Amino acid sequence: MSVLKEFKEFAVKGNVIDLAVGVVIGGAFGSIVKSLVDDVIMPPIGLLIGNVDFSNLFFVLKDGAKQAGPYVSVAAAKQAGATTLNLGLFINALVSFTIVAFAIFMLVKAINRLKREEAAPAPAAPATKECRYCLSAIPEKATRCPCCTSQLD
């Protein structure tokens, strides 16, 4: 079998296509969550804390060789060659990760619940026999009929 044909069989399998779709949707979901955190959630939190812009919350560890601080933004510090600890960007990434992890947890939890419902076997019908005197259905191991009280063999 040629390498091209083997690759085609591998690529067309359902699992590979599902994985590719998952990666694309995951990337899109990640960018939506990043925008949600950066543009919707963190600005009000920064306002409540005291007019803090988390995207520009940083500490200068070492001034830049091109220009000494203070720097108005992370971009200005990086342009000057300063070494910075970007705490605000880390907080934004942490909030984004928490939202994505919680969404994935809820999705997996729902899928597992559906799998358990599918996998639950139907309860087996009780083994019964017919009473030869009154013809009612009685348990297989019964020695006396509960309906007519006849002694069974």
Curated annotation (Swiss-Prot):
Gene Ontology cellular component annotations, sorted alphabetically: plasma membrane
Cross-referenced PROSITE patterns: MSCL
Keyword Transmembrane on entry: yes
Membrane topology of the entry: Multi-pass membrane protein
SUPFAM superfamilies per record: Gated mechanosensitive channel
Localization annotation: Cell inner membrane
GO MF annotations in UniProt: mechanosensitive monoatomic ion channel activity
Keywords: Cell inner membrane, Cell membrane, Ion channel, Ion transport, Membrane, Transmembrane, Transmembrane helix, Transport
Claim: tRNA-binding is one of the keywords in the record: no
Coiled-coil portions: none
Transmembrane parts of this sequence: 16-36, 88-108
Pfam families: MscL
Role played: Channel that opens in response to stretch forces in the membrane lipid bilayer. May participate in the regulation of osmotic pressure changes within the cell.
Subunit composition and interactions: Homopentamer.
HAMAP family: MscL
Family: Belongs to the MscL family.
Protein name: Large-conductance mechanosensitive channel
Source organism of this protein record: Chromobacterium violaceum (strain ATCC 12472 / DSM 30191 / JCM 1249 / CCUG 213 / NBRC 12614 / NCIMB 9131 / NCTC 9757 / MK)
